[in-house]
Amino acid sequence: GIPCAESCVYIPCTVTALLGCSCSNRVCYN
């Protein structure tokens, strides 16, 4: 996937989740 410039180590994907990104290997991917 495409990295969404947001990490999800301590908290889930927030802003980028609205753009269809999901957590994978502690990084939000689209």
UniProtKB/Swiss-Prot annotation:
There is a cross-link at G1-N30 (Cyclopeptide (Gly-Asn)). InterPro entries: Cyclotide, Cyclotide_bracelet_CS, Cyclotide_sf. It comes from the Eukaryota. This is a cyclic peptide. It holds the Pfam family Cyclotide. Keywords: Disulfide bond, Knottin, Plant defense. Expressed in leaves, petals, petioles and roots but not in runners (at protein level). The presence of a 'disulfide through disulfide knot' structurally defines this protein as a knottin. Belongs to the cyclotide family. Bracelet subfamily. This is Cycloviolacin-O1. It comes from Viola odorata.
